[in-house]
């Protein structure tokens, strides 16, 4: 962990939301929100890429050190928690970054608490998914999308090394393994050998997943938020292969519906490496710098 890092916490309904802070003396505050089965350490490479920015990142309710916070979960509940963290950490406005499900949380936050946010960067997330086809329920759809990331929640691991091997074999990460990825993975483990497990609540994942499906033609993405915003999307998905999470026809639809939201397509990177690889973190950092 970087020498500029420290643990943080903020009071929320039901207990304390935990997370981390990097570069505390930075002039501009960035708040970064992680994905559905992730934790705040996913943003360590972004902190390295933004040495002049103070970066705050929570473990969302039901994940990491916030795993014991009670439900209900859901996108709006997470948005309320992150708003509490912003207020407890000096107040806004901040530049808000949301990756994957964190993009949905970030979009909900700017709709509900626009005064807390000066700029918004969505990273391969935040645009609602069309409801699953008839005969496919949300749990099936999310299992197909997340693959190994969801499967691990039902498993135990005999050692930290075994968990590292599981993640090293992940098709989106095996060529991008680094100290930062190893730290992110290790932080996720709770319990004791030989029954180590992920900190992520499968109940939280199931409830949060439902909030990501909505008819895109009726979705109110940013509400009355008038600050600068942009979306980065990658060409490869959660298993490291094309296509990305958002098909081209969905991007065309959103460019037409929301011309005020520039959409930048990032080649070569996948849903994980856009955040965890230095080249991906650099692209996100560049987007942050255009808004701050």
Give, region by region, the residue ranges found by the protein language model.
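A catalytic-pocket lid/entrance helix-loop region that shapes and gates access to the active site
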Residues: 123-157
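Alpha/beta-hydrolase fold catalytic core
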Residues: 1-30, 51-54, 92, 144-146, ...
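Catalytic histidine-centered segment of alpha/beta-hydrolase-like enzymes
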Residues: 266-278
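Conserved HGGG/HGGXW glycine-rich cap/lid loop of the alpha/beta-hydrolase fold
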Residues: 18-68
